[in-house]
């Protein structure tokens, strides 16, 4: 046998072994009789993500749509079988009823290379997650939200004044509400004045944008963190961008240290982090700062995008805007002309509008869990093996015509009492559900509602000739946000409404 023959035989053998490996791994769902996305060699179902053709949000939505009328669908993360669930009843089992078997997320970071990123509530697993979440949960209790209310309302009123000062010119609400939510979040959760609304060069704004900037390399990092944690042992990657992490860690460390020195109690996240250090004597500095980083990152994008999407839809639907403004005026009139915590809770149409915004534009486009023990899907013969990743496309679920007819239409009436009662509750989960839902959802909702209230009291929001219709979502980000600028017009509706008092 010549060297060439030996080489060709070796190649043939390797290709044969590769074919056997691929066939064995990619027959998992077929052998179970589960409807699945046809895999491709080596990459499984991940080709569109690997070629940057779509964002993770659109990728998972595509898997959801491929399920058709099936309650779930299998796919492959490279050679690893994964399952996407679209049936609300099964989701209720996974997220709530059988939560003990699905407590962990797949999302991870390498604790040796990225100790802060790996230590946040989104990534930590098992009993440690329970311990830290229990210490942080009271940050968002009703009592504390009432204290935070005035801070959030003040930030919303400053935003209104900023718009009024700009006069008759279009405002890019995408940028505006990033600054608004950043100032509100820093003040409300950390006791820090970030001063970004009037200062485009503010450091918190600069590093916030840097943290969320989406590049091809960051896309690959996201692929590892959210879909294939095994790759974290190969690549030197971080959940949060390095330079912004360094700046924010220093800022949050200073805030915590200063609060510990003064003993000042502000009923915010900093107080909860100090309490965390006292309650868990073995808690690390990385775990404390990891929570601060998580809340900053989550609040920076999700809340601001919800505000921008809300204003965009209200500009496109003036009849909805007028009805909402009327409700705001009537409720505030019953509360002495003031915007109060109790008054906001009585604004039922506002709640319907915000619910529809979050249906059409869910803050998190998908959620994930990991099956901790073999799990028999109720009512079937299918068993999900231990270690199988489970995904839910919130974007796909909320825009599924089976649950929401004409899903691209903006229609708050979907959430009136009559229609809401006729829809499975787990077909609408913008913040997830169960014990591992979004811990800050009540603060996020309050922030969005107060901005809407303060702006609609004084201003009419309208489209501009440069406003994109229809809206294009960015294919390059993890959280939902529009592609490019989002200019809208704000027209004062009368001086009598501008001076509404705060409470």
From Swiss-Prot:
It is found in: Endoplasmic reticulum membrane; Microsome membrane. It comes from the Eukaryota. One of its GO terms (molecular function) is heme binding. Gene3D superfamilies: Cytochrome P450. SUPFAM superfamilies: Cytochrome P450. Its cofactor is heme. Coiled coil: none annotated. Detected only in testes and accessory glands of male adults. Pfam families: p450 (PF00067). Heme binds at residue 438. Keywords: Endoplasmic reticulum, Heme, Iron, Membrane, Metal-binding, Microsome, Monooxygenase, Oxidoreductase. One of its GO terms (cellular component) is endoplasmic reticulum membrane. This is Cytochrome P450 6l1. The gene is CYP6L1.
């Amino acid at each position: 046998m010549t060297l060439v023959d030996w080489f060709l035989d070796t190649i043939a053998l390797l290709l044969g072994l590769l074919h056997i490996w691929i066939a064995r791994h990619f027959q998992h769902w077929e052998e179970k009789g589960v409807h699945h996305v046809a895999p491709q060699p080596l990459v499984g179902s991940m080709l569109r993500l690997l070629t940057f053709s779509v964002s993770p949000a659109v990728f998972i939505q595509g898997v959801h749509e491929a399920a058709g009328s099936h309650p779930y669908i299998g796919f492959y993360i490279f050679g690893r079988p994964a399952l996407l669930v679209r049936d609300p009843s099964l989701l209720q089992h996974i997220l709530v009823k059988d939560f003990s078997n699905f407590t962990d997320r797949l999302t991870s970071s390498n604790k040796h290379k990225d100790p802060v990123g790996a230590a946040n509530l989104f990534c930590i697993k098992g009993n440690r997650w329970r311990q830290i979440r229990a210490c942080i949960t009271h940050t968002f209790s009703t009592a504390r939200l009432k204290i935070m209310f005035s801070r959030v309302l003040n930030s919303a009123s400053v935003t209104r004044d900023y718009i009024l000062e700009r006069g008759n010119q279009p405002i890019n609400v995408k940028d505006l509400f990033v600054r608004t939510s950043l100032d509100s979040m820093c003040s409300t959760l950390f006791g820090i004045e970030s001063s970004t609304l009037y200062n485009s060069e503010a450091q918190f704004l600069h590093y916030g944008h840097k943290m969320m900037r989406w590049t091809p390399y960051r896309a690959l990092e996201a692929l590892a963190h959210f879909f294939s944690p095994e790759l974290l042992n190969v690549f030197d990657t971080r959940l949060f961008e390095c330079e912004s992490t360094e700046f924010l860690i220093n800022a949050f460390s200073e805030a915590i240290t200063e609060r510990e020195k003064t003993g000042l109690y502000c009923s915010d996240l900093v107080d909860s982090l100090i309490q965390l250090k006292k309650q868990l004597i073995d808690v690390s500095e990385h775990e404390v700062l990891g929570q601060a980083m998580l809340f900053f990152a989550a609040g920076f994008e999700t809340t601001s995008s919800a505000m921008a999407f809300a204003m965009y839809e209200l500009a496109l639907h003036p009849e909805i805007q007028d009805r909402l403004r009327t409700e705001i005026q009537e409720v505030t009139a019953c509360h002495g002309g003031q915007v109060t915590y109790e008054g906001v809770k009585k604004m039922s149409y506002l709640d319907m509008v915000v619910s529809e915004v979050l249906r059409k534009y869910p803050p998190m486009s998908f959620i994930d869990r990991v099956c901790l023990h073999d799990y028999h899907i109720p009512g079937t013969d299918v068993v999900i093996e231990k270690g199988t990743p489970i995904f839910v496309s919130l974007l796909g679920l909320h825009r599924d015509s089976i649950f929401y007819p004409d899903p691209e239409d903006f229609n708050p009436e979907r959430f009136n009492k009559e229609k809401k009662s006729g829809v499975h509750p787990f077909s609408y989960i913008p913040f997830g559900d169960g014990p591992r839902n979004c811990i800050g959802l009540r603060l996020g909702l309050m922030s969005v509602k107060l901005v809407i209230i303060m702006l609609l009291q004084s201003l009419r929001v309208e489209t501009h000739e440069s406003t994109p219709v229809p809206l294009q979502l960015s294919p390059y980000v993890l959280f939902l946000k529009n592609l490019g600028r989002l200019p809208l017009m704000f027209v004062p509706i009368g001086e009598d409404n501008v001076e509404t008092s705060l409470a």
